[in-house]
Curated annotation (Swiss-Prot):
This is ATP synthase subunit beta. Its EC number is 7.1.2.2. It is an enzyme of class 7 (translocase). It comes from the Bacteria. Produces ATP from ADP in the presence of a proton gradient across the membrane. The catalytic sites are hosted primarily by the beta subunits. The gene is atpD. F-type ATPases have 2 components, CF(1) - the catalytic core - and CF(0) - the membrane proton channel. CF(1) has five subunits: alpha(3), beta(3), gamma(1), delta(1), epsilon(1). CF(0) has three main subunits: a(1), b(2) and c(9-12). The alpha and beta chains form an alternating ring which encloses part of the gamma chain. CF(1) is attached to CF(0) by a central stalk formed by the gamma and epsilon chains, while a peripheral stalk is formed by the delta and b chains. One of its GO terms (molecular function) is proton-transporting ATP synthase activity, rotational mechanism. Keywords: ATP synthesis, ATP-binding, Cell inner membrane, Cell membrane, CF(1), Hydrogen ion transport, Ion transport, Membrane, Nucleotide-binding, Translocase, Transport.
């Protein structure tokens, strides 16, 4: 990929072929879809075109060739005010984004333009947003655990370095808060760079995240520099056209690939929300006139998801560890969008509304959440055994709940009563105060080491803390804090 400067067209690749500077005209505008007619050579599929109207330049991406002289394009910005007959110029290359250290601490849009009002991005290199996945011989197998400091995650569904993690949950169960906590914890403990792609989510949350990152020191803003910043942000929020929302994840991924391939870093790539990527693809697909498949999704759902996910991997140079929030429509995990995402993930962290309703946060379902790294060869025999014991106790409690609801606790055997008591303590101990939620709760956040997590749960499973009240286990870090809380409860009783 040849180098370009910031002053050149924000989209065109330099040294473009005979396909650059071809001029066409708009023949039809249907919302985000624009048809353009050319007299001679047609631009390639996925090429970027520029159309200037009302004093603004909008980028179009070629999606289909619909005739000998006509292409159908997706607009990356609003087409309000665009008229038939307007001149369109082909750039001869794909949409490209600036990459490199200059992007850290900045907010970019889908075509790589800064939207944080801090001037142009200091970068002398650009990557196209559509890139090939690393070849088979370039990839590296990852078996190292990424410690997050969140008890329920580290114990029951540990994340792999260079792996892909899905955060599944319906509306309002806490996906974004967990992502913010992970960015906070891992930026502090891990020290590497992160890229955050805001795909079709609330602009307010994107704004909050930007200021929270400044407060946490993850983004450092100087007079005209962002030196020392650890994260680059790319936003295509829910008020933007479907073209921008369908491509913003690819723009963010190109930024992450630079740090992996050119600088050999272990990069964290956050996507909030991968469902909106699929949703935008469905909107675009319908506008392009494709026949929808199951539940109205695009027929190319699996292909589009695969093209994105296959680029997120570990190579011999570095790794990209991805954490993706997945909105689950109507809490239905069999919906084609979350189901297509499941196939690519190494770990799934499922958030459950019934757990959130009990006031247990993070509302991670300890029985539904899975990880292929929960294996004695990777996490060690002790960790594996403790995790399985915790799940066994919680599963037994779940199966006893119907009996308890009908007959009451008194009808249970002594062994079952003991299991229920321990399960309720474990359930509460899986809750944890978050640093990013301090402003709402007033409770200081806790980052718990993996050793403390395994040791604490091992002791609870063994019955060493059966004498403590259930309330002592709620919203604490390590087991020592639960003991101290029990003492305090005894004093105030």
């Amino acid at each position: 990929m040849s180098e370009t400067t910031q002053n050149e067209a924000p989209v065109a690749a330099q040294g473009a072929s005979q396909h650059s500077n071809i001029v066409g005209r708009v023949t039809q505008v249907r919302g985000a879809v624009v048809d353009v007619q050319f007299e001679g050579t047609l631009p390639h599929i996925l090429d970027a075109l520029h159309v200037t109207f009302n004093g603004q330049t909008v980028v179009l991406e070629v999606a289909q060739e619909i005739g000998e002289h006509e292409v159908r394009c997706i607009a990356m910005d609003t087409t309000d005010g665009l008229m038939r007959g307007t001149e369109v110029v082909a750039t001869g290359g794909q949409i490209t984004v600036p990459v490199g250290p200059g992007t850290l601490g900045r907010i970019l849009n889908v075509i790589g333009e800064p939207i944080d009002e801090r001037g142009p991005v200091k970068s002398d290199k650009r990557y196209p947003i559509h890139r090939k996945a690393p070849s088979f011989d370039e990839q590296a197998a990852a078996t190292e655990i990424l410690v997050t400091g969140i008890k329920v995650v580290d114990l029951l569904c540990p994340y792999l370095k260079g792996g892909k993690v899905g955060l599944f949950g319906g509306a309002g169960v806490g996906k974004t808060v967990i992502i913010q906590e992970l960015i906070n914890n891992i930026a502090k403990a891990h020290g590497g760079v992160s890229v955050f792609a805001g795909v079709g989510e609330r602009t307010r949350e994107g704004n909050d995240l930007y200021y929270e990152m400044q407060d946490a020191g993850v983004i450092k803003l100087g007079e005209d520099t962002t030196e020392g910043s650890k994260v680059a942000l790319v936003y295509g929020q829910m008020n933007e056209p479907p073209g921008a929302r369908a491509r913003i994840a690819l723009s963010g991924l190109s930024l992450a690939e630079y740090f992996r391939d050119e600088e050999g870093q272990d990069v964290l790539f956050f996507v909030d929300n991968i469902f909106r990527f699929t949703q935008a693809g469905a909107e675009v697909s319908a506008l392009l006139g494709r026949i929808p498949s199951a539940v109205g999704y695009q027929p190319t759902l699996a292909t589009e998801m695969g093209a994105l996910q296959e680029r997120i991997t570990s190579t011999k140079k570095g790794s990209i560890t991805s954490v993706q929030a997945v909105y689950v429509p109507a809490d239905d995990l069999t919906d084609p969008a979350p189901a297509a995402t499941f196939a690519h993930l190494d770990a799934t962290t499922v958030l459950n509304r019934s757990i959130a309703e009990m006031g247990i946060y993070p509302a991670v379902d300890p029985l539904d959440s899975t990880s292929r790294s929960l294996d004695p060869k990777i996490v060690g025999e002790e960790h594996y055994q403790v995790a399985r014991d915790v799940q066994r106790i919680l599963q037994t409690y779940k199966s006893l709940q119907d009996i308890i609801a009908i007959l009451g606790m008194d009808e249970l055997s002594e062994d079952d009563k003991q299991v229920v008591a321990r399960a309720r303590r474990i359930q509460r101990f899986l809750s944890q105060p978050f640093h990013v939620a301090e402003v709402f709760t007033g409770a200081p956040g806790k980052l718990v080491s993996l050793e403390d997590t395994v040791r604490s749960f091992k002791a609870i499973v063994a019955g060493e803390y059966d004498h403590l009240p259930e309330g002592a286990f709620y919203m604490v870090g390590s087991i020592e804090e639960a003991v101290a809380k029990a003492e305090k409860m005894k004093e105030t009783a």
